[in-house]
Curated annotation (Swiss-Prot):
Catalytic activity: Endonucleolytic cleavage of DNA to give specific double-stranded fragments with terminal 5'-phosphates
Keyword ATP-binding carried by entry: no
Coiled-coil ranges from the UniProt annotation: none
UniProt keywords, alphabetically: Endonuclease, Hydrolase, Nuclease, Restriction system
Gene label: ngoBVR
Protein role: A P subtype restriction enzyme that recognizes the double-stranded sequence 5'-GGNNCC-3'; the cleavage site is unknown.
GO MF annotations in UniProt: type II site-specific deoxyribonuclease activity
Provenance organism: Neisseria gonorrhoeae
Name of one Pfam family that matches: RE_NgoBV
Record-given protein name: Type II restriction enzyme NgoBV
Source domain of life: Bacteria
Length: 175
């Protein structure tokens, strides 16, 4: 197993794997039915799962978080889980990023006792056509503070439904 940083993985995906020119599809098999998934709302989770498979196939050291509701998605340093944390955020490139960065209370509480505030965000802008073909259009590696913005009366942008969630800014140059 080789140990890579988030930046090295980012560079490898862009430079060696040429991820921005790769094409894919999401297929589902159940019984004797085989379909190509054409619903965009599942693509982000599938891309995250694919990244884990890619890391495994390349024999890159990582652990997956057991708590899917808290960052990070991946620990890139198995011996020191306070360093090299990676969270995947994928969004439809033809729309505004609609993902929540984090639940504010969880994020503020955890920032005092663990290093999630230093987590790198792997931001993936994808496109899916009407035939279910998926392409990665853009890839960014950012820190939380690099993709947030302020809002009226607050230092950070929130949305409130059931909880206060930190929202991303339009830093990705989407349409």
């Amino acid at each position: 197993m080789i140990k890579l940083t988030a930046q090295q993985i980012f560079d490898k995906l862009l430079d060696e794997e040429k991820i921005l020119s790769a094409n894919g599809q999401i297929r589902f098999f159940l019984g004797d039915v085989d379909i190509i998934v054409k619903q965009k709302d599942v693509v982000g989770n599938i891309i995250q799962e694919w990244l884990g498979g890619w890391l495994r196939k390349r024999e890159i050291e990582f652990d997956v978080s057991t708590n899917t509701q808290m960052p990070p998605d991946f620990f890139l340093n198995k011996k020191d889980r306070s360093r090299e944390l990676l969270e995947v955020k994928a969004f439809n490139r033809n729309a505004c990023p609609g993902f929540d960065i984090a639940d504010f209370k969880m994020y503020s509480d955890e920032s005092f006792i663990s290093p999630i505030s230093g987590c790198r965000l792997f931001n993936i802008g994808y496109d899916m056509d009407d035939n279910g073909n998926v392409t990665i259009k853009d890839l960014w590696l950012k820190k939380v503070w690099q993709i947030t913005r302020s809002m009226d009366g607050w230092a950070i942008n929130f949305k409130s439904k059931k909880a206060w969630c930190i929202k991303s800014a339009r830093v990705f140059g989407t349409a």
